[in-house]
Amino acid sequence: QKEIKPNYAEILKELSSLEIVILDKLFDESNREQNYQKRRQMQFSKQKISEIFKLSNEQADLIIENLYRLNLCQAPAGHGIAVGEYQFALRTTEVFEFTTFGYYFVQSCKWNK
């Protein structure tokens, strides 16, 4: 029997059924890459997700921002832009990545391995 970790159960409560389907699709795509480093760097497009699931820009942003909030996905890492001596990172939902936590969360929740 599959063990679901308690913190995973709490996260499941915070996801809509559509978000779960999207995470499944991201996982299936990520799972094709066996190399951990390459898998970590895989990026997904908001535009492609919007087309597949027929989402408006606003709906896609809400979903992606919720996945960021739950630390299941993240914006791609970058060095940002320097303004004077201060650097800041650009925040985007146009392109996003699975976090390692997100990948293992979906793996733990999948019943049909």
Cite the ranges covered by each PLM segment.
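Short, amphipathic alpha-helical interaction segments positioned at domain boundaries
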Residues: 85-113
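Short amphipathic alpha-helical interaction segments
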Residues: 50-82, 91-93
